[in-house]
């Protein structure tokens, strides 16, 4: 139970940043940045590189929200030392505002960068943006949609701290389950078009 709590304490800023970024992307703030990252580029196969849903607003938004969420979470944890001790990164690094600014921004960057290959592959397989595959790929991509960004966060964390295979697997399983639950809440709040 303690190890599950440690994983959640470590991942919480990324989870919060993802929710805040979804709200931000649906808002009218900075609409000028709501432009596709691929600028409408169509490759030789006649398909878009990433599609309309991968925007600069979402890309930079996740980096900024990641930094802000990490800072706020770190300040909260400072007031609860028993929880702060469980944070996997703070076992190796001091919990400072500057450190958390960088950590949160880089986790946000890892999150959005590792979503891009998934979008690229889905466009090749003619899976529409923001939709679930309706063919034999359905369950494969439901799973990949939940873990692609988590893989990015794990790889990034490995540059900072040692993670056991159990911790990495725990991040994927807990993160995927949490991602599905949060997606449902965002769907019910009409911030997301797809339940998965």
Regions flagged by a language model, labelled:
Residues 1-152, 161-196:
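Interhelical loop and helix-boundary elements at the membrane-water interface
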């Amino acid at each position: 139970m303690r190890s599950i709590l440690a994983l959640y304490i470590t991942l919480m800023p990324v989870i919060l940043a993802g929710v805040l970024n979804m709200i931000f992307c649906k808002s009218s703030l900075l609409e000028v940045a709501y432009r596709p990252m691929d600028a409408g580029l169509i490759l030789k196969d006649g398909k878009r590189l990433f599609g309309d849903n991968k925007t600069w607003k979402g890309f930079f938004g996740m980096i900024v929200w990641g930094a802000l969420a990490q800072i706020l979470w770190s300040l909260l944890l400072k007031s609860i030392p028993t929880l702060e001790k469980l944070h996997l990164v703070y076992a190796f690094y001091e919990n400072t505002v500057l450190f958390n600014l960088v950590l949160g921004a880089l986790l946000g960057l890892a999150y959005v960068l590792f979503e891009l290959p998934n979008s690229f592959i889905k466009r090749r397989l003619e899976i529409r943006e923001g939709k679930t595959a309706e063919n034999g790929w359905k369950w494969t991509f439901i799973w990949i949609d939940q873990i692609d960004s988590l893989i990015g966060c794990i790889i990034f964390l490995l540059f900072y701290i040692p993670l056991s295979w159990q911790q990495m697997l725990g991040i994927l399983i807990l993160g995927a389950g949490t991602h599905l639950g949060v997606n449902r809440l965002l769907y019910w709040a009409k911030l997301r078009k797809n339940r998965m």
